[in-house]
Amino acid sequence: LGQIWSEINPETKVTADLEFYIKPAYLEQVQKREVKSIEEVKFFEPCTGSGHILAYAFDVFYKIYEEQGYNPTEIPELIITKNLFGVDIDQRASQLASFVLLMKGRQRNRRFLRTVETKNIQPNISFYQDFEFDNKFKNATALGSLIRVDTLELKNLVVEKNSLFAERQEEVKKLYQLLGQRYDVVVTNPPYISSSRMEGSLKQYVEATYPETKSDLYATFILRCLELCNENGLTGYMTPFNWMFLSTLEELRKIIIKKHLINNLIQLHNSGFDGATVFICTFTLRNKNINDAKGSYIRLSDFNGPQNQAPKTLEAIKNKNCGWFYTSNQGSFEKISGNPIGYWATEKIIKMFSENKSLENFASLAKGMDSGKNDLFIRLWYECESHNSNYKLDNSSSTFNNDKWIPYRKGGEFRKWFGNNDYVINWKNNGELVKSFSNSNIRNERFYFQQCLSWTLLSSSFFGVRYYEKGGVFDANGSSLFYENEEGLLQILGLLSSKISIKALQIINPTLAFQKGNLDKITINKTTNSINKGCK
């Protein structure tokens, strides 16, 4: 909101009072906005909840009105009736948000509630209801602000005043108006619900209407807020930061990179909130792309604990050379396979991605099996008798005779180069018992018994890749890489254990999960036949 107003009125001093305001690095490239009154600036919260965001927006609007010389007794009414808009699926929450705004008005003007009563002032906050007579809002309590309303539908909407449904029609008209107009600023903390947890009608609607972001509801709201925003307006969010890296949300990243502009983004430490480990970022998007513009980024990944997040953010805003403040042209993200928002990547890293082929072009990477019940089929190697254990099999033929226990790679603790050979699996008769178990999932069997590299799926420390000789099978937690010969495999082991690959992997996916799809995208310069003999 402060940014929008500073573009309308460049002489404003309001942004100087906003301690977390980040002045865009590309400000000179922004097209001058049409001059308009502060009364015309519209702010929308599509998932209002109890009104925390609207309450903060009220304070910023108040500063602007004061600076413009408005009568202090008139400002609360103007903000509530002209500037702030919100809606929620929960009636109680929307009522509480309305109450919060009225109390904000009372805080600024002790006679405000008297004005509310005499003028019948109502905040522009509504709640979703299911309206059986209107197909668009039949499942409104499930779909909420994801419902799309176009201007033609809004124009053609008629309230039949003599109808028995006149009052209900007035209520649905409010929702059409809220979702049919466009706003200068749209800000929200959207619901976080993965597709597997969405209820039927919501899941069906999201898959049909927002296919690019169907994997998580918060990602769908990122797009929806941009739709609700004026061209060149700003949207603001607090969401998980996995949209920046997950392969399932690559299409969302492509849309943002091509059509919009990441204005600024703060990536919090995963311990940034008391009592919870959450991967959160807060960011703003401009509803317009500006060629060669650089967004501003603050990376708090190295600062543990909630007590560090705000101070380190303020330090970065004041001192751009602090080491955790970055500016980046989002066009460079397109040069990295998967389009991750790798804003801290150096020019050398970007060049490495753009000039070399990814690992998937040279090697096969595969996710392993799920036994379905490890306690039933898996043992530590020393728990089994040696006479029916075999660690050097080329194939499963001998398991039809005496061999029962064979090596089983299932990740394990952080270890580089070699190791974590702790487990064996009952593979008697080519895994007959495991394969017949109802909950098992046998994947990529063609790679079983081959020499390979493997790593642990989840790690709270560092990425470590290990070499394994032929003779075993592998687990989903021990995804593996296969190559045509041992020399090439060892060369790749050296590459993946290098600092440069670790840096590349952190850009592709800086979470605790190292998935097959992440390693696929690491680039390799395959112009030499030299072997990293140190890996032996």
What is each residue range found by the language model?
Residues 55, 62, 89, 94, ...:
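Signature of N6-adenine DNA methyltransferases within the class I
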Residues 37-40, 44, 53-185:
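Class I S-adenosyl-L-methionine-dependent methyltransferase module
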Residues 446-464, 473-475, 492-506:
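Short Ser/Thr-interspersed hydrophobic loop/turn segments at strand-loop and sheet-helix junctions
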